[in-house]
């Protein structure tokens, strides 16, 4: 696929400032966010990382977030992952459509986890619709092991908040989730993803 040229950096060193952040031994920020690491119960060592992430979520400009996301351009999972976390933590709902589109496109690995978190953090009926659109497209694809478990966990979280039942039809016996999860010997546990989303949204 041919992509248009990347968007220019609106500031000097946006990726270094928000995506990399720390050198060894702490390691780059995106590794702390990968697989929801900062939201796991045993992640007490991540407190400074979370504090810095909160500060940066308020500090980063919309222009810098668009630069990190590079919508419609060559994707980078690291910068997209971090951008989506910053968007979700600061509840920047004006990025809702962009995040939903990137999730549905699923152009690159790992960043879908953060899109699901951001939509869960927004927690509105519109976000539930975007997650169901993703699940309707990708749960029938038993050959694709994308972020279906993250999307379903995020949808369960929104159901808990809104008192809705969007996730129920996927979790029915012999339903779409059971068939997708049963296609591999070690399927992901959707309840674990839901609990992780709960922890992440409480940050």
Q: Model-found features: residue ranges?
A:
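Extended repeat-based scaffolds of very large eukaryotic assembly and lipid-transport proteins
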Residues: 1-82, 136, 141, 148, ...
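Structural detector for internal amphipathic alpha-helices that build alpha-solenoid repeat scaffolds
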Residues: 47-56, 81-90, 112-124, 145-157
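Amphipathic alpha-helical scaffolding segments comprising HEAT/armadillo-like alpha-solenoid repeats
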Residues: 58-70, 92-104, 124-137, 160-171, ...
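Alpha-solenoid helical-repeat scaffolds
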Residues: 73, 77, 93, 109, ...
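Extracellular-facing segments of soluble proteins and assemblies that are Gly/Ser/Thr-biased and enriched
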Residues: 73-108
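Boundary/linker segments of alpha-helical solenoid repeat arrays
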Residues: 107-116, 139-151, 163, 178-184
């Amino acid at each position: 696929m041919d992509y248009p040229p990347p968007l220019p950096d609106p500031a000097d060193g946006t990726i270094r400032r928000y995506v990399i952040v720390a050198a060894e031994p702490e390691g780059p920020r995106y590794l702390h966010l990968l697989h929801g690491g900062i939201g796991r119960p045993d992640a007490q060592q991540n407190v400074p990382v979370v504090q810095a992430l909160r500060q940066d979520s308020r500090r980063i400009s919309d222009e810098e977030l668009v630069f990190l996301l590079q919508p419609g351009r060559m994707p980078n999972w690291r910068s997209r992952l971090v951008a989506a976390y910053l968007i979700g933590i600061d509840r920047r709902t004006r990025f809702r459509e962009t995040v939903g589109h990137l999730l549905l496109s699923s152009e690159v690995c790992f960043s879908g986890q953060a899109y699901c978190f951001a939509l869960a953090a927004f927690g509105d009926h519109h976000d539930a619709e975007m997650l169901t659109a993703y699940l309707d497209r990708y749960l029938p694809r038993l050959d694709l092991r994308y972020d279906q478990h993250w999307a379903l966990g995020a949808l369960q979280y929104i159901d808990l908040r809104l008192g809705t039942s969007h996730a129920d039809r996927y979790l029915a016996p012999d339903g779409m989730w059971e068939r997708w999860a049963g296609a591999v010997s070690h399927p992901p546990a959707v309840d674990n993803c839901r609990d992780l989303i709960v922890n992440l949204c409480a940050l």
